[in-house]
A protein has these predicted regions:
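GST-like domain detector, emphasizing the conserved glutathione-binding G-site
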Residues: 1-253
Length: 253
C-alpha cells in the first residue's frame, strides 16, 4: 500500500511540472566523458537541471548531496569553494564548473544542442514555483542524508526525469549518498509513450534506430525504467519496489 501511494504522489509531482523531462532529443551525441552533477533530488533547481538532461538525452555521473551530506562535500568544496551549493556541474569536456540551474542549463543547451534554454525549464518564477510544489508533494523526499555503505563503483540507473517509478529510486540513491551513472532514456517518438507494459502504439515496439533505447532493447530484450545495474554485486533489477528493497538491504545501515 505504501509503495502504491508513493507512486501516486510521484505522478502528482510530475503533473505539477507538466511532465517536463519526458521527451528526449534524437540527435545529441554523448561526450567522451560524462559531466558530473552534484545533485539533491528534492531541490527545485536541481530538478530543472535534470529535466534539461533528459531533454538532451545526456548521461551524467551523479554525486548525491542531500542535506547533512558528507560523502562528496570535500569534492564539491574543492571544485567550487566552501560556500558552493547544488546544483553544481563539472563538465570535463569543456573544462567548466558551474553553479545554479540557470548557468548549468545555459551551458548544456549551448554545448550539446547549440541552442538557448527552452522556456519551460528556464529558471523563471513560474518554473521554480511549480518545481517547489513538486518537491512539497513528495513530502521532502531525499532531503536528509541517511547512513549507508559506500560502493566501490558507481551504480548505473536508466531513468528519465518525469518517470513516476524512477523518482523514488533516485530519492533513495540520494538519501543514501550512492553515486550513480544516470542514463537518460527520454521518449523520442509516439511509440515510446506510456509504461513499458502498455505503450500507446499498435504492434511490436521498435525504438528509434541507433539510440540508447534501441541498444537497451537489443541487449536486454526490454526497454523499461527504472533499470538498475550494480556492478559491485553483478546485479540487474527492474521494478522500483524491487530496486528500493535491494538498496535498503545492501547499502542502508
Amino acid at each position: 500500500m505504501f509503495h502504491r501511494l508513493n507512486i501516486i504522489s510521484s505522478v502528482v509531482s510530475s503533473t505539477l511540472r507538466s511532465w517536463h523531462g519526458s521527451a528526449g532529443s534524437k540527435s545529441v551525441k554523448q561526450p567522451p566523458q560524462p559531466p558530473i552533477l552534484f545533485d539533491n533530488e528534492n531541490s527545485p533547481e536541481c530538478r530543472l537541471v535534470r529535466e534539461a538532461l533528459t531533454e538532451l538525452n545526456l548521461d551524467v555521473l551523479i554525486y548525491p548531496c542531500p542535506e547533512g551530506a558528507d560523502r562528496f562535500a570535500a569534492q564539491l568544496q574543492q571544485y567550487g569553494g566552501s560556500n558552493t551549493s547544488v546544483p553544481f556541474l563539472v563538465d570535463p569536456n569543456s573544462h567548466v564548473k558551474l553553479e545554479g540551474a540557470e548557468a548549468i542549463n545555459a551551458h548544456l543547451f549551448q554545448q550539446y544542442k547549440q541552442s538557448s534554454i527552452p522556456k519551460h525549464i528556464d529558471t523563471n518564477t513560474l518554473n521554480l514555483f511549480t518545481s517547489r510544489l513538486a518537491s512539497i508533494v513528495r513530502l521532502r523526499g531525499a532531503i536528509r542524508a541517511k547512513p549507508s555503505r559506500e560502493p566501490q563503483k558507481p551504480l548505473i540507473l536508466y531513468s528519465f526525469e518525469s518517470s513516476p517509478y524512477s523518482r523514488p529510486v533516485r530519492e533513495r540513491l540520494c538519501e543514501l549518498q550512492l553515486p550513480y551513472h544516470l542514463i537518460n532514456l527520454g521518449k523520442q517518438q509516439f511509440a515510446d509513450m506510456g509504461p513499458a507494459s502498455f505503450r500507446f502504439h499498435l504492434g511490436e515496439y521498435h525504438p528509434v534506430p541507433n539510440t540508447k533505447r534501441a541498444k537497451l532493447l537489443a541487449e536486454k530484450g526490454r526497454v523499461q525504467v527504472p533499470f538498475l545495474i550494480d556492478p559491485n554485486q553483478s546485479i540487474e533489477l527492474l521494478e522500483s519496489k524491487d530496486i528500493l528493497d535491494y538498496l535498503n538491504k545492501i547499502y542502508a545501515m
